[in-house]
Each structure stands twice: as C-alpha cells, then as structure tokens.
Amino acid sequence: MKLVVVESPAKAKTIEKYLGSGYQVLASYGHIRDLPSKDGSVNPDNGFSMVWQNYPDKAHRLKAIEDAVKESDSLILATDPDREGEAISWHILELLKTKKLLPDDVERVTFNAITKAAVTDAMAHPRQLDNDLINAYLARRALDYLVGFTLSPILWRKLPGAKSAGRVQSVALRLVVDREQEIEGFKPQEYWSVEADMEADSIGFTSRLIQWRGQKLEKLSIADKTQAEAAQSDVESGHFTVSNVETKPVSRNPQPPFTTSTLQQEAARKLGFAASHTMRLAQSLYEEGLITYMRTDGVQMDESAIAAARKTITQRYDGGYVPDKPRQYQVKAKNAQEAHEAIRPTDFSRDKAASGDHARLYELIWKRALASQMASAKLERTTVDLTDGTGQNVLRVTGQVVLFSGFLTLYEESADDNANDRDGKEGRARLPLLRAGDAPLKKEVRADQHFTQPPPRYSEASLVKKMEDLGIGRPSTYASVIQVLKDRAYVTLERNRFIPSEAGRLLTAFLERFFERYVSYDFTAGLEDSLDEISGGRADWQKVLDAFWHDFKPKTAEVMEQQPSAITAELDKFLEPWLFPDKGDGHDPRECPSCHTGRLALKGGRFGAFIACSNYPECKYTRGFGQGEDGVDDNEPVLLGYMPENSDDDGYMAFSDQGDILPANTASASETGVTDGGIAANAAFSGKGNSASHTDRDDLPFDPDEPASSTGNVASSQSRMTGDETASSGNSRDSSAHGVSTTAGIDAESQAGISNQALAGKNNAGRTAVSDNKGNNSSSTIAAARKGGSTDDNATVSDPDGDIGSGASSSGQDADNRLLSHRNGDIDSRAIPADHKDSSSDQNASHALSPDRNSDDASVSNSDKKIDSKAVSTGHDVGNAITSDNSPSDNVAHLASTPSSATSSVKVALETENNDTAASKADEQAKEEEESRKARAVTRRTGRFGPYIQLGEGKNAKRVSVPRDVNPREVDFSLASRLLALPREIGLHPESGKMIIAGTGRYGPYLNCDGKYARLSSTEELLDIDIDRAVVKLAEAAQNKGRTGATLSREPLKVFGDSPVTEKPVQLMNGRYGPYVTDGETNASLPKDTTPESLTFEEALALLEARAKMPKKKKTKKAAAKKPAAKKTTTKKAAPKKATTKTATPKSATTDNATSEDGDATPAKSPAKKAVAKKTTAKKPASKSATKKAPSSKTTAAKKTSKATPKDEVAE
C-alpha cells in the first residue's frame, strides 16, 4: 500500500478516484505547524534557526497520517506545486523524521491539473523535495515573523489603536493612504470643450474642436467661459467642409490566459468578487479537477491544451477564427515565476461547470483561455478633419468599424476607470461615408465646462494590479494581504473602493516617520527579488536575512526607547501640513474653534488618535483624526439621520444588493395606491379583505400598528365626544382626522323641509345627495367609487329601507366618494352621547365627508325630515367610503347630535367649533410630527459600556453596540441603519430550504441556519455576505466540525506558547462574558479594542500579568453581603415594615434602568430583577397564614430579597 498526502480532502477524493485500490490518499488540511507567537521562535544569533509548533486542531489529522505511514510501504508527497506546497511536504517529512516514522521510500510528485492523465503522469515521474523552494519559504516566514513580532509590540506601546504591522500589508496600506492624500491634495482645474453635432446621409455624429484661431488645442487650453463662448461663436458662424480623411486598419490581439493576479482583477471588475472570494472559488474548482492550479505567474499553456483549445474554436465557429499558428505568451509582470501553466480549464469542450459563483468564475476562466487562442479582431479606424473657410478652426471626429470580430465574439477584457479619460468612449462611433470637400449639416454647437478629477481610489482590482506592477508581495498572497487590511479595520470599502481608516492613516504616518525605509516600495520589492533569487538557488537565505536584521534591529530598539508622548508629538509635527493646513488667510489653523484660546494637537485615545483642545477638560472640543474642522463633543449624542416612516415596527430595514436602504414592509405603488404624485384614494393592505383609506405618508389616517377587522371592515378609531364636539369616524387615528357633525331636532327646519348644509371643501367641491326610496327627497348624482376599473362619474345611491348609516370603506381604486349604508336600516348608536340618544336613536341618520381637494360635498336627506347632515372638511385627500355592513352591530358610525332652537345658532356654534378644532388639530399634528421624528432619529452615543447606536428615544428605543472592529467616529447613517437591521435574513439554504440568518453575538458575527453556526471574520463580512458565500461558510464550518454555544467555549480559539509563570499553554478561549486568555491559573478578558484574531502571545502575557497583579476583593464583598441576609430571614416581625420601605427600592431600580436606556448600549438588567423579587416578598409576609402556607421556593425568594436589602433599611 502506498500513502499519498495532499492538502485538502476534496483534492484527496479526486486523486484517490484516479489512482485505484493500491493507494491510500489522506489530507493534511493545509499547513500542520507554524512559528509560535512568542519570543525566540526565530533566533538570529543561531543562524536564524526556527522553533516550530504543531497546530492543536491538526492533532487528529497528524495521528491519521502517522498511523497510515506505519502500514504503508512508501510515502508520496503530492502537495501543490509552489513554494507553500513544497513547505507543507517538508513539514510533514520533518515531523515524521523526528518521530522516526519516515519510511525508506519517500517521493515528491507535482501536477498542474488534477486530471487522470496529469496525476498518472506525475506518479510515473517522481522527484525529491526542492531545497531551494524550501529555503525561500524559510526566509519569507522568518522575515514576516521578525517584522511583525518586532514592530507590533512597539505599536501596542507607542501607538494607541494600532493592532499590527507587516512586511507586505503595511506597504499595501501605504498605497491606499498615499492615494487618499493625493485625492485630498488635488486642486480641480477648470477647462472647456467645444463640440458640434453634425449630420450626413441621415447619420449623426459629434465632432470636437481641436484647433482654434490657428493654435492646436490641448485638454486645458480653453480655460474659462469667455474663451469657450468665443470659440463656440467661431464654430457657429463658420462653414466647415471635410479637409482630410484618414483611414487605417487596426488589429486587436487577445489577452493571455489568466494568472493569479489577472484573475483576481478581472473577477473583481466583471463579477464584483473580492480577491479572497475569488481564490476560494478557484481553489474549489481546482480540487474538483475543473481548472489548472490557480496560484501561478505563468501565461503559457501546455501544447496539448493549446491543441484542445484550437479544436474547440473550430467546432464552435469556423476556421477563420483560428490563427495560422498557436499563440505563445510571455509574462510582463515584475518578479514573475513561470514555473506553472496559466489558469485554464482542464477540458475546453466543457463551457459550463458547477453552479452559483463557481459557475460564473469557471465561465470567465473558460472564455479567457479559449479567446487567447482565437484570431485577432480586425477594425478600421477613421479620422476626419473639418476646416472652416479661414483655415484657422478645425473640427475632428474619430470612429471605427469592426470588420472581423475575431476573439471579440467571445471575450473582451474590462478596464479600470480613469477619471480624466474623456477619450475612452470616443473613437467607437459609426461614421457616414465622408469625402474631401463634403459639407455635413451643422445642427448644434455647444461649449461644455469640465473640471479635472482626482485619481480614483483603489478598487481590489486596481490595488492588486498596482502591487503587481511594483513587485510588492506575491500573487498568491495578494488576497490574504488585502483581507488582513480589512480585518484590522485599516481600510473600509465604500462602493467597492478602499478608503483608509483613521487607524490605518495613523499607522502609515508612524511607519513613514520612524521606519520609512521598511515601508518604501523599492525596499519591499527588493526583498521579493531576493526571495526569488533564493528560490532559484542563486542566493543564500541566511545571508539575506542577516543583511535585513543588521539594520532593522537597532532601529526598532531606538524607537522603543521613546516615550508615547514623544511619539505623538513627533506625529503631530509630521502630520501638521495635513491635519492643520495653512489656508493663507492669516488665521492660526491650530486655534480651537470652540473656546478660541486653546490650541489643537494630536492626542492618543482608546480608539486611536484624535484632535483635541489644549484647554481640556474646560473645553471638550474634539474631532476625529482627519475629520476636518467640524468637531464633536463625545458627551453629546450625534444625530446621523432619520429612518423612513414606513419602516417596520422594530425599525428593522431591508437592504438592496448595493446596500441601499429599502423599507421593510412597503408594497408597490399599485398595491398601496401611493403614486409619484403622492395620493391615491384607497390602499389595500394585507389581511382577509381588510382595506384602509390611505392618504399622504406624512399623515396616515389610520394606525398601521392596529390590526384591521377580519370581517372585511376597516379598523377605525372610535372616539366618544359630548356637546357640540365633533365625533370622529372612519379611518382616523384621532378625532381631528375625519370630523362629522349632525344637528337634530330643528323644528323650524323640519316644517319647511330638509335643509342640507354642507361645509364646503377648499377646492372644486362637487355635490352629492343621498335619499331614501320613500319619496321624501329627490336623489342627486354622486361621484361614486370606481370599482373593478369602472370610471363612472355619476351614480345615484339609495337606501331601500330609508335608513342611512355610516360604515367601513370600500377598497375601490381612485374613489373620490364612498357611501356608507346599512342593509337593515338601523343606526349604530354606540358613539352617540348619552344625553342625545333619545332624540336620535329612532331617526335615520347619515353623514358624509368632504375632503379638501378634488372631492364632493355630500348632503343627506331622510324620510322623517328631522336630521340635518353636515359635510365637514377633513384635510385629507380621501373621499367618502362606499361599504355595506352585514349587521347593525358591525357598523362603526360615530354620530354626535347637537340640539338647537335656531339654524343661526347652529352656524355660529359650528364656525367657533371649527376654528378651535383647526387650532387643536395643528397643535396635535405638530406634536405627532415631533414625536415621529424622535422615534425615527438615529444617533451615535457613548455610554457606560462603550459606543452604541440608538434608534428613537426613551425606554422603547432600539440600541445596538458599535462592533469592536468598527471605529465609532466612522459610523454614518448607512452603517448605523444596517447595524440596527441585524439580524438579517440572507436567503434560503439551497439544500435544507431553511433561512440563513446573519447576526452578531457575544462571540462576534456569525451565520445561523437551522441551528448550525459559522463564524464570520468581520462586521464588513457580516453586512455584505451573500447567499453563495454564506452556504460556503456553513459548509466549511460543518467540515471543520465547528461547534457553538457551551461546546464551543470549551475548546481554545488559539493556543500560544507556554506561560513563563505557570509553564502551561496560554490559550485564547470563549467564555460566558466573551473571549479571554488563560495560563491555567489566571484568566484575563480581552479589552474592547482588541479582537481575538489580532491577539498575539505578547499581548496575552501582558493581559495575564496585569490581571494577576490586581487585588481580589470580590469574594470578601460577597461574604459581607450574606451576613445581613441571615438576620433578616429570622426576623419575621419586621416583615410588615419591609412593605413600607420596599416601595422605595423599585424606584431606584427604575432610575437605573432609565439611565441605562439613555446612556448605555446595554440596559442594566440585574436591578430590575431585584426589584421584582422585593415586591413579591414584600406582599407575602403581610399575611401570617400566607406565610405558613408558603412553599420552599417562596422562602428562597424571601432569602434572596433579604440579601439584597441593607440592614439599616429594615430598621427604618
């Protein structure tokens, strides 16, 4: 039996299928050991010897390999064919050697693609380990350790908020910071262009002025509006004819197949993938045997692969799309190693594979590789110059025509944007056939103003390209370097562009000031050259390390001796031109804008650097590092914005794929009736036939929190009013929304007949009448609701029984009027004041609403001629409702009857009442608007437990802590809204059909799907992760047997070296109150500004040392608290007195809670629990019988209460 060892289980499964029964294939699951994070792991004084430590979570993997080796005849190391793969094989070999398990026959095989042919060929041609590659790995690992382990402790002690520094990551961060400084220092320059729209042979085109008054125009030649208008005038008045036509053929060649770098760039541009996501997908495709090895600098393809590609092109297209000779490519990137093929599909006949993001990436790789062997595209580029009669002014137009598409039929490479590239979109226009002497029609001439733009911020694609161009890092490390910058919160992503955070800018400034050489682009690229020389056997790895360490060590010792205050002062001077720029107005840029006497300076704080006034604490003016002149006071809440009014009850919001805020429970315009114009008469809401009248978003006439009636009637707000007050009906949140009044018992009016007095609406009021069928009043027309798409303008509505009443609204569309009627002819008198029921209960009654705009007045007549109905202006764009009730008991009419002896008295009373009502309505509306704004306000605050975000005010406010990896000063409304929306639903799992939830807990961000959890690396990943990445994360967690809850907390997150105090391993654990470190005897919680991922061994030792020095007083306090508790339980006679004193105890608990709600992200819960316990026990001792019958659980509760009550309280 032969044992084959590879890195991953997927690769092992594929290879085992090809090799057959004579082989056993096991996976090491990546690296098996590394340098421990402790002093002495690399010893420069002993030839840079290294001490390795096995990963604790790989113990069972190693055990499986060791057991299998014992039963095998030979060992075949088949890890990846690069520096890291060679290192993994070397580590396995060294480990087996130390345990004396190494078999006699050890071979190394490599293959660029996991296909049957490649694997069997590799097995037939084994080799030995490549010592040059191993030495290059050792040199790189030692360099990273020496830089990181030496610089990071300096940062922790001298630079608040800094987490780590690295040989490559710090240089990549400098690129981002330098670009940001370019943007900030950029001064836009105005320039103008003059263009003319022309036409010939019915084909339009645009020409640009390139020569004016005999001078050739450059981009910035026309600098102001005056010049532009003069040039525009000359073009308008000139007669232009074609003076020159130049046509030349152009060929475009395809790009070579992907390297690691170009794959990351193109996947970011075309697919929007992060570099790390691209590499995870490519790794999976490689292990499944679908593509070749994905970590490569090479652009060449194997001859057999080229032949397969040319065959596929011929089959899919025709012979004209295949070049005469196969295309050969050579890499142009700096520090490239062409040991491996380019990234290509293993089978060109397969144009689709896998699913989701895997399929999208595979298709991109397949198209690029196939197009690289296709024929060139043939184009014809034409340039036409048009000159006016003076010969001084020249217009130019450029166009091109594709004669043969060639490879463009299949693939065209994307390009990064260029802010100042105005010609990028030119040159592709279709031009008419123009000859010398032709005079195209001049249609319009325009002068356009422009401003030069700063260079764009780096995207992942452009940052990778820049790193590749400068020779910084290796293509295989680009993704991990960028991910570290994001995980450390040194950069943030905004619209897929990198912006340096305050911590990132401060770290870069520190390194530039004190370690400028080691973060220079040339020095870093030079180190990469040295590593390549080691890989090729042309340099000694120990000499390279010695040359580096000889200068680096003294520099770090020099900086370590300086005090933090001196470091901050140096940075203050170094950053002065940026932090306090001189505006040239004679004003001191360091003068405090708040007190005007203090001077601003750079200070260090818990969350990093900031600008503060020298008069602190008298003046509390501060501003963020790089924030500008608008400072803040951290003691005051900072308003970030307002939530939309139609967010759901909890303030949770939904987000689009681009991160835009979407109301969680909004329906479409067709569903709600809300149009762009603002108002529709009706809105249908979810429920069993429920409908509600919908007006403006700023003043809903119904309570969205109240459930609608399940019988199909609108849920209404019933208000009972007395005297001459107006009774509310319909869909109203208060009595001012829809007011209806009726006067009854007017004898003078009844003798002469019905007098319908309608208080007219403000705009275009029509008239509506309602009559019975008893002949007492004629029916007039009514603009009825358009039901089922009906557009009838007039409708006569009658009541067969002669009894009209009000009910619930209909749900017809665009209804201006809705009539409320009863089938049984009875009036629901529940809302009628008691003193008027006798005069109105036996009468037929109806009322109508008259809105302010585009609605109708309504008058009502009845057979008894005793009721005078008034239509009162409602102030809303809602008409009258047409709905029938099934029974009188379901009717929701509100009728207020006002007895009077004269019509004039009624009119005066109504006018006075309307004035008062209008004023009170305005006050109430203003109050409601103010309360609504407070409830929707999103603020950033700082409380006892740190910074947090709050939505609303008071005890009902929603709060969420600012995550540890987010700088509180950088939280804007968009980020705050997304944090408040957590946890969020990502989508249904394609296998289980269960919802995947992304949230954050005591252990940080996580994914949850049907009780299965997966960790997320950062808040950014929590907010941005999509369904495909979430499924991959959950699968990886299941594969790694990740556990959650109590089980997870029992296993260490990270194991450091042995403690110098206890000589036991120092471990990072998950505890009940969050992550902590332990050395077996002392436990120390992590500070809030330290993430578990960034914690190093030195930090852990410092935390444990500080915790061990702290006095232990908690146990003494607990013992003292138990003594009065015992006395109180035995003193039964004092129980009645407790009832009087305990009324004050809940008050203190309430006060604590209120303080927590207003000032802290996490309300204090323990005082509330004590208050409940005291109230319970205070009542029970009052009755002796109750005390005797009390079970043991109540006695325990009484004991707990007595413990919480001081002795002097009982005495009172």
Curated annotation (Swiss-Prot):
Residues 687-742, 758-937, 1107-1212 are annotated as: Disordered. GO terms for cellular component: chromosome. The active site is at 293 (o-(5'-phospho-dna)-tyrosine intermediate). Residues 708-742, 770-782, 881-890, 897-906 have a biased composition (Polar residues). Mg(2+) binds at residues 7, 80. Residues 164-169 are annotated as: Interaction with DNA. One of its GO terms (biological process) is DNA topological change. One of its GO terms (molecular function) is zinc ion binding. Residues 1141-1151, 1183-1199 have a biased composition (Low complexity). A zinc finger (C4-type) spans 592-619. Its cofactor is Mg(2+). It catalyses: ATP-independent breakage of single-stranded DNA, followed by passage and rejoining. This is DNA topoisomerase 1. Monomer. Releases the supercoiling and torsional tension of DNA, which is introduced during the DNA replication and transcription, by transiently cleaving and rejoining one strand of the DNA duplex. Introduces a single-strand break via transesterification at a target site in duplex DNA. The scissile phosphodiester is attacked by the catalytic tyrosine of the enzyme, resulting in the formation of a DNA-(5'-phosphotyrosyl)-enzyme intermediate and the expulsion of a 3'-OH DNA strand. The free DNA strand then undergoes passage around the unbroken strand, thus removing DNA supercoils. Residues 815-840, 921-934 have a biased composition (Basic and acidic residues). Residues 1-114 form the Toprim domain. The keyword DNA-binding applies. Residues 130-556 form the Topo IA-type catalytic domain. SUPFAM superfamilies: Prokaryotic type I DNA topoisomerase (SSF56712), Zinc beta-ribbon (SSF57783). Keywords: DNA-binding, Isomerase, Magnesium, Metal-binding, Topoisomerase, Zinc, Zinc-finger. The record marks 31, 140-141, 144, 156, 295, 488 as: Interaction with DNA. PROSITE patterns: TOPO_IA_1, TOPO_IA_2, TOPRIM. Belongs to the type IA topoisomerase family. It comes from Zymomonas mobilis subsp. mobilis (strain ATCC 31821 / ZM4 / CP4). InterPro entries: Topo_IA (IPR000380), Topo_IA_2 (IPR003601), Topo_IA_AS (IPR023406), Topo_IA_cen (IPR013497), Topo_IA_cen_sub1 (IPR013824), Topo_IA_cen_sub2 (IPR013825), Topo_IA_cen_sub3 (IPR013826), Topo_IA_core_domain (IPR023405). The gene is topA.
